[in-house]
Amino acid sequence: MGQKINPIGLRLGINRTWDSRWFAGKNEYGKLLHEDVKIREILHKELKQAAVARIVIERPHKKCRVTIHSARPGVVIGKKGADIDKLRKKVADITASDVVINIVEIRKPELDATLVAESIAQQLERRVAFRRAMKRAVQSAMRLGAEGIRINCSGRLGGAEIARMEWYREGRVPLHTLRADIDYGVATAFTTFGTCGVKVWIFKGEILEHDPMAQDKRMAEGDNSRPRRDAA
């Protein structure tokens, strides 16, 4: 089962928590959920070049706090904060709450599964050999301290007539171990031959304590992220 299921969903409530962190009654829940979906769609569309890994949405009293985890915070903020002001206005058009946007810089994008998957997808679109792109990503992750990494690429790889799946793994990736800190990301490459799917699993060690916020704390305390910048 651990081989098939999304490893993030499998570990929710154990060592990983949700990216939407709020509670609402049944009358409000549907409306707020649709707002979250629209906010994420707009931010991913506007920040294509900013290497955004995660968008966390919290809703304290009459506020909407959006935390953007990005490898390029300068692209998000823009010159003198101009771009982030535009983002805040676009998000404010969706929700009636006061919008606060925070930015967290990811210092080691090579250890973030979503960013690794997007990087490989972009290389496939530029016609880089898929084996070279996969091998380079694996070597970078292992060099920076990952305990294991697995990458799957599927589709008409290299322009082949018949679609197939190729994978590459180094180190351990224990998908059945619930205490394992496994990051998972997917991306799609739109090539001239059709779409190619990229999946990445990165094993960063084990989290022994039962704490849904453990992964966030590890990112904040380690080298993966710098202190957050408030852009209220």
Curated annotation (Swiss-Prot):
GO term, biological process aspect, one: translation
An MF annotation (GO) of this entry: structural constituent of ribosome
KW Phosphoprotein (keyword) present: no
InterPro entries found in the cross-reference section: KH_dom (IPR004087), KH_dom-like_a/b (IPR015946), KH_dom_type_2 (IPR004044), KH_sf_prok-type (IPR009019), Ribosomal_S3_C_sf (IPR036419), Ribosomal_uS3_bac-typ (IPR005704), Ribosomal_uS3_C (IPR001351), Ribosomal_uS3_CS (IPR018280)
One Gene Ontology term, aspect cellular component: cytosolic small ribosomal subunit
Pfam families: KH_2, Ribosomal_S3_C
Residue span(s) of domain KH type-2: 39-107
Protein keywords: Ribonucleoprotein, Ribosomal protein, RNA-binding, rRNA-binding
Binding partners and assembly: Part of the 30S ribosomal subunit. Forms a tight complex with proteins S10 and S14.
NCBIfam families: rpsC_bact
Family: Belongs to the universal ribosomal protein uS3 family.
Alphabetized HAMAP family for the sequence: Ribosomal_uS3_B
Biological role stated in the UniProt entry: Binds the lower part of the 30S subunit head. Binds mRNA in the 70S ribosome, positioning it for translation.
Name this protein carries in UniProt: Small ribosomal subunit protein uS3
Species the sequence originates in: Rhodopseudomonas palustris (strain HaA2)
Gene behind the chain: rpsC
